[in-house]
């Protein structure tokens, strides 16, 4: 009999716990934002850069903050609760910009859906970007503008891919990108990628049947994994 009472009690505890979990309210709004420098949106590799998001009042630990990934166009989004206050933390050495030694945190008070701007100071900017495709020869150029002195340029590259998500990792592979390390601040860099050796089919390392590819340029600073990029360009190629 005691064993039966014990089992019934245990069953009730499980039921009440399940009800509490079922009644847990899910986030009801997306906190949205973008990475900017003087109002200008900063482009990066898709989902490489992250910020930490947490709600004040909790001890900051891996179980109380959320890693928010930044898309290639510099935007980010995370599910939160409307009307609450949150903090966004920049992490050192994860982006192509200067580490914030004084204030690395943005406080978002009483959030109700407004677009949050995360200000950063890049080491370099890629200005006056342009790209075209003549037949199957992709040509792109940009001007290297130094924002923060003291950091060497490791490389500048042109990357061509099958879709709009294109960078130094996501591209057509061998023959689908061109890189150079002979670059100085203030210089206009022009690079070309010849696609004539690629076939047209559905594999990741071939040209798409749509007749379009995407290309953009990127710059890597020595000692920083994350690159800064131009916007992607949609280019038609000849079959």
Write out the residue ranges for each language-model feature.
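Short Pro-Gly-centered beta-turn/loop motif in secreted/extracellular proteins
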Residues: 72-87, 92-93
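Short strand-edge motifs at loop-to-beta-strand transitions and within beta-strands
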Residues: 74-78, 104, 114-116, 187-193
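Bacterial Sec-dependent N-terminal signal peptides
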Residues: 1-41
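Short edge beta-strand/loop segments characteristic of extracellular beta-sandwich folds
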Residues: 32-36, 139-147
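Beta-strand-rich modules
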Residues: 195-227, 239
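Structured interaction patches on ligand/partner-binding surfaces of diverse proteins
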Residues: 93-119
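Short, ordered, surface-exposed loop/turn motifs in non-cytosolic proteins
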Residues: 40-61, 151-155
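Short, acidic Ser/Thr/Gly-rich low-complexity loop/linker segments typical of extracellular
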Residues: 57-75
